[in-house]
């Protein structure tokens, strides 16, 4: 039976509703992992390092999609909760058109800047050529990639999370099958990986575009709209935390690469790339839960249902806390086989990766609480507070930690810097939740 945003959510009903979003994010991470797995084993560690070096730049330019998706869907869900369906649809249409326009501009910019940015990141020789080549090809699909991120949020708001999951699975399977064909069978190496990524992202972005452009059973259909500068401003403010998360992550990943290159060279970048791929799968559970539950929070906030807000917050904090314990234990158990699958062909790289992941995975214990805390305030249309949490978590604390800890603990200081940043952010998140309880009445 279809679950509606207006219902009271038990644990069972809440997990049923967010499950497609969690699976969607996990699957998105998995096909990214498969991409890296094929490149590492068939194209070599230089090509693998190139992807990890240029990826922060790609993700930085695509951050607009995350901002519009999370910030815009929160506003649209709140508008639905207030009973203004026509206005909600016009806001939706305007945001999609803006994403397309912005994506085209950023795609051109990315293609032009791929080589100079790679040089600035420290690439040279074959590493520079690989970075430039991969970046220029994948920037061709930046617009549909941004659309995919926007539509996945709106699928949940439209009470169609299963359809969003289906689109991601279709895009992911396309990417993985083409990875196998282009890299393993036809020997196209890094070019094959880039083309496979482009094809998968085009499906992920254009299939939802066609769905919402045609007559459908959701509350939304692309159509005529107006220019709503206030809604755009509110979307940017509301989604600023997600924008900050992606931009900051790109900056931090670049800084990690610099530090690792300084301490252990190219092997450090390859090891960090492996850890990040696996990390994406684990934290995808938190991001999927946050994406899936945010429209529920926004709807009940718009409907002024304070009792349900309290119910959602309590259940969500318990869920993310318990998940953190299980994920930490699982990560410790699978560290060795995962490192062997990715980089088992190089003994030194294998040991570096395994050791680094066992330290890094301690962050799973607490990062879910911070991810949900930031998302919760976005859903409450408090983008500034959400952005503050994200800014401190992904930039200030992580940058400080990765610069300071290696002075005392060398390479282990790099691996443990994220844990310190998450612990400091947890204190900030707890203070924000306690301080704002009288405003939102969730306690």
Task: Walk through the language-model features, giving the residues of each.
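Hydrophobic/aromatic residues in alpha-helical transmembrane segments
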Residues: 35, 72, 113-114, 151, ...
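Helix-terminus/linker motif at the lipid-water interface of multi-pass membrane proteins
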Residues: 30-48, 118-125, 181-188, 250-281, ...
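Hydrophobic transmembrane alpha-helices of multi-pass small-molecule transporters
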Residues: 60-63, 175-180, 205-209, 280-284, ...
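Short alpha-helical transmembrane segments in multi-pass integral membrane proteins
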Residues: 1-18, 76-141, 185-240, 297-363, ...
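N-terminal transmembrane alpha-helices
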Residues: 6-43, 56-71, 75, 79, ...
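Transmembrane helical elements of multi-pass membrane transporters/channels
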Residues: 16-35, 137, 148, 171, ...
